[in-house]
Amino acid sequence: MDYVIGGGLAAFIIYAAKKWNKTEKEKIQHTFQNIGYVVKDKEPKLFKTHKSTTHTLYTYHVPYGLVDDPKLEVLEKVLNKPVKVSFANGKLHIKVYHSKLNNNYSYDSFESKGKWIVPIGKTYDGSVYHDFDDIPHMIVAGSTTWGKTVFLRMLMTHLIENNPNGVEFYILDLKGRLAFNRYRNLKQVKAIAGDYKESANALKKVKKSIDKDMDYLRSIDAENAKEANIPTRKFIIIDEAGELKPDKSMSDEDKEYTKKCQQILNHIARVAGQIGYKMIYGTQYPTKEILDPQIKANALARVSFRLATSVQSGVAVDQPGAEKLECKGRAIYKTVDDYIVQTPFISKKEIWERIGRYENDPSSKEDQKTRKNTVHFG
Ligand SMILES: Nc1ncnc2c1ncn2[C@@H]1O[C@H](COP(=O)(O)OP(=O)(O)OP(=O)(O)O)[C@@H](O)[C@H]1O
Ligand SMILES: [Mg+2]
């Protein structure tokens, strides 16, 4: 008698796989029961399934009283795929993405979309960009080494490449001027400050420039930079705003400088956005003391890399989640909507290949003229 070894076993494996490998739809339905996302014996009923290249969208009729519940976050672990749950038009929508985000997307995989539009990152649905002419001020939060400085440098590189003659930077590089020192030689960088006194001086220059621009706008009866056809945009970048918090160890003089800085930064946040001044406020410590309410209320774009606690996440992006971000460069980008993004990675080498030609470029006449007015502190 001949035996075919394995034949019966193969049939059993296929049978068992069918039995135990439940479909996504079945797993979701079981999860509803197991976590008690039901009303008495009534549970959500699948109403429509829509498949696309990036995701499958399941839409459910739910019993009255059920909405998008944080309990449903477990679906991400149950399905081992990224899941977005929302509740709209009386229905529950569960979007299950086919794959997770990569841990690295190179900067050159993003397009150039316009003068003041910068790439923010890849989401599950594609790339996301930010328009600084729509939303002028941005807070960039994140604990140490999760990606703030790479992100700030990437923004600068993009803005310089797109507007070599129309963008200006004032940089407060408050961790000893280590992150942006080389940028001082760029023609677009008008001031770079590494301590309190230099920061106060740099911001006083910005304040003077704002006053002048305001006078000009009033004289032509224009309300904003676009209406007045002002081509230049001025970016004030703060890399570690936490350093500007006055504390007991500071000299009285330094306390005064930090107060002056805070005062001018508040002024920029409140009045200067629409006249062409954009503030990018970076901090490791998003606490109520460091994120002044005026600045928070006016910085309507937020980018948060990983933070230590959900409380910090609440301060930075008004919602928990930043404490759970998994890898370097991963962030929550929030304006009206919020997205999980993997921000573009750019190396120092690539940055200087792209913008190195604007370092100490004495060949252009316009360049020489601007550089005369350029103030380098320290
Ligand atoms: N978008 C990104 N994609 C992949 N890796 C990244 C990304 N951004 C940063 N990294 C990695 O994380 C490291 C630290 O990043 P970065 O210097 O920007 O941190 P940081 O938040 O500024 O830290 P600190 O607060 O200490 O200054 C980088 O050297 C790089 O290896
Ligand atoms: Mg840094």
Name each model-derived stretch:
Residues 218-227:
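Short, glycine/acidic-rich hinge or "gate" loops at secondary-structure transitions
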Residues 226-234:
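Short basic/glycine-enriched coil/helix segment immediately N-terminal to the Walker B
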Residues 5-6, 10, 15-112, 116-121, ...:
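N-terminal "pre-motor" subdomain/linker immediately upstream of P-loop NTPase catalytic cores
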Residues 341:
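Extracellular glycan-recognition surfaces and repeat-rich motifs
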Residues 312:
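Surface-exposed substrate-engagement region within the catalytic domains
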Residues 1-23, 57, 103, 107-219, ...:
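P-loop NTPase catalytic phosphate-binding loop
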Residues 320-336:
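Conserved C-terminal "switch" segment of AAA+ ATPases
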